[in-house]
């Protein structure tokens, strides 16, 4: 038996719950056969898969080392902890949870500082006045350096934060911060504001692939199946199934429906009796139903879709392209 594909997921909290729910919606049930406290698991519907429950930061590290094939972690951790990240890992799919921004935040009392250009002026003046560089508290050392350099800001020094970064200016350990935020409420509560152009990265949880993992034929096939489930669920979320039958339904009418409502005909045009199945974006359903009834349909039924499997899986195509020598 070949070595299993290793999929790393967060080991605790909301990220674990969201990751497990994401895979469950795709028809992949993450299970811990040896008990809830175990840090290894399986996918109930698949053989040749091992789930590794790790912290989000450990997942990024293990991806970089090639110790896991796929992992669920934030893009912020990937960009911060992996040098040349785009060469060593691939962001296969954004998962729609764990969203947060890495931002530059300064005291609200700095009323004349709104942009990185303003900050550059302030850091220069601060050094001239105090004979030392302005301090930036952060856990995101590499992201900070790259972003500040891209804006020409050089008169600062980083103070590595081990605790609540947003409190650093108030207690006097730094003049400003780079931190991650979801709503900005915590920053505001600590008297801080985000610079107008101070968003370093808009992050979310991603399914990430490691180039250096042992991508055997078995591992690739398992990855293909996992990604097929995910892509099918994502495509199903984009549409609702619309069915109707009436004699006035023809290819000309369907072409107009496509242009006006963004529908697709996954199984071709109407049958000789006018029976047709359409896939329609959710926000255009009522308009499409009205259109079809205006043209002769007596009944239009609408149903949710669980999965829509296409011949080509764009997620697996992305993985294969990344792994290609």
Swiss-Prot record:
Write out the GO cellular component annotations. cytoplasm
Domain of life of the organism encoding this protein: Bacteria
Q: One Pfam family for this entry, by name?
A: HisG
- Extract one GO BP annotation from the record: L-histidine biosynthetic process
Please give the cofactor(s) recorded in the UniProt entry for this protein. Answer: Mg(2+)
* Nucleotide-binding as UniProt keyword: yes
Protein keywords: Amino-acid biosynthesis, ATP-binding, Cytoplasm, Glycosyltransferase, Histidine biosynthesis, Magnesium, Metal-binding, Nucleotide-binding, Transferase
Pathway field: Amino-acid biosynthesis; L-histidine biosynthesis; L-histidine from 5-phospho-alpha-D-ribose 1-diphosphate: step 1/9
Q: How is its activity regulated?
A: Feedback inhibited by histidine.
Keyword Nucleotide-binding set for record: yes
Q: What Gene Ontology molecular-function terms does this entry list?
A: ATP binding; ATP phosphoribosyltransferase activity; magnesium ion binding
For this protein, the record's PROSITE patterns field holds: ATP_P_PHORIBOSYLTR
InterPro entries, per database record: ATP-PRT_HisG_long, ATP_PRibTrfase_cat, ATP_PRibTrfase_CS, ATP_PRibTrfase_HisG
Q: EC number(s) for this protein?
A: 2.4.2.17
Q: Where in the cell is it found?
A: Cytoplasm
Q: State the similarity comment.
A: Belongs to the ATP phosphoribosyltransferase family. Long subfamily.
Q: Which PANTHER family match?
A: ATP PHOSPHORIBOSYLTRANSFERASE, ATP PHOSPHORIBOSYLTRANSFERASE ATP-PRTASE
According to UniProt, the name of this protein is ATP phosphoribosyltransferase
Source organism of the structure = Nitrobacter hamburgensis (strain DSM 10229 / NCIMB 13809 / X14)
Source lineage: Bacteria, Pseudomonadati, Pseudomonadota, Alphaproteobacteria, Hyphomicrobiales
Q: Which gene encodes it?
A: hisG
